[in-house]
Amino acid sequence: MTTSFYFLLMALGLLLYVCQSSFGNQHTRTFDTPKHRCGSEITNSYMDLCYRKRNDAGEKRGRASPLWQRRGFLSKLKARAKRNGAFHLPRDGRGVVEHCCHRPCSNAEFRKYCG
């Protein structure tokens, strides 16, 4: 192989490096760039962004506290009725998975789901 071939190969490599370094900075992410979070990324983001915030679904829905927080005991029949009734609670379908997994969301939008 001739020296002109090596020179051409080095010139192309250098050109690719310069193009990558100059155009690659356009797609960098900042801290609050919207991104998709699915699966374990939702849990990790929740632990990072919602540190020490309580998430109580009963308070958000305006319903009573869970059975384990009440003072008295319920009969088995009443406990079963409450448990089965909680299964049919209406859902609005706009949870964190629908919002941040199916389309990208920023950290500020994700924090709205913190307790």
Curated annotation (Swiss-Prot):
Q: Name one Pfam family in it.
A: Insulin
- Extract the PROSITE patterns matched here: INSULIN
Parts forming coiled coils: none
Question: Where, subcellularly, is it found?
Answer: Secreted
Principal subcellular localisation of the protein = secreted
* 4-hydroxyproline, modified sites: 34, 104
As given in the record, the signal peptide range reads: 1-24
- Subunit structure as annotated in this protein's UniProt entry: Heterodimer of A and B chains; disulfide-linked.
What protein name does the entry list? Con-Ins G1b
Q: What does the record give as the organism's lineage?
A: Eukaryota, Metazoa, Spiralia, Lophotrochozoa, Mollusca
